[in-house]
């Protein structure tokens, strides 16, 4: 799969487990992101990254977003992908995806066909 296609399945946008402001986190530019994928109870993929590897810090993203736009409260940034499974990898119905971010929590979703 071409990477943008792998991130934007039809009818899908997992966000969570909670919304936080960057000011509520000690250092939003140094958070560990971990991804684990389980199939039939077995770990089949695991990787981690950090927000420190982002091309722009959150303050810079906010500055550019608000430069020419009115931005309502609870606006959410959807940024790039720091964790990339191998090209031959694909999620299957029933797979369990866990994504954890330091100071935020763990989002856990099971893959379903819609």
Which residues make up each language-model segment?
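Catalytic-pocket segment enriched in acidic/His residues
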Residues: 1-114
């Amino acid at each position: 799969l071409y990477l943008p296609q792998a991130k934007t399945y039809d009818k899908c946008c997992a966000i969570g487990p909670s919304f936080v402001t960057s000011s509520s986190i000690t250092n939003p530019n140094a958070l560990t992101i971990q991804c684990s994928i389980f199939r039939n109870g077995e770990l089949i993929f695991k990787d981690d990254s950090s927000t420190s590897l982002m091309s722009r810090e959150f303050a810079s993203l906010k500055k550019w977003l608000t430069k020419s736009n009115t931005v309502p409260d609870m606006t959410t940034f959807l940024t790039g992908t720091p964790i990339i499974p191998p090209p031959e990898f694909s999620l299957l119905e029933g797979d369990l995806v866990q994504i954890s971010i330091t100071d935020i929590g763990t989002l856990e979703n099971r893959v379903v066909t819609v």
